[in-house]
């Protein structure tokens, strides 16, 4: 069976559109410089420790996507840390496990949770950045 280039590209594009939920806040991979700049700017920050094989992380993703798209979290700077490949970032934020969520108000850590998949408590955690 052969597929046209157009059909393959259409499917790939549809997968990107359906699979990706845009967050209102800025999202970036964790870098020490980016994290420090956000802290110095006094931004509300979420550091999300994830792993592609982690079922709890997969359960947290739609909750975070929904909450981060709310207008009150529009200025939230989200830094994603890959548990397997960014060990230096884990040390920087003193995280020991995947599915860890850490929130900051500027340079001050204001909350942390590990393995939380309750929308209400994740929302309460993010609200601490406001």
Predicted regions and their residues:
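Non-catalytic, surface beta->alpha helical segment in thiol-disulfide oxidoreductase systems
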Residues: 103-130
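Typically the conserved alpha-helix immediately C-terminal to a functionally engaged Cys/Sec
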Residues: 58-72
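N-terminal export leaders
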Residues: 3-9
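N-terminal signal peptide c-region/cleavage motif recognized by signal peptidases
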Residues: 17-21
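A short beta-strand-turn-helix
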Residues: 27-43
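Thiol-based oxidoreductase modules, predominantly thioredoxin-like and allied folds used
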Residues: 68, 73-87
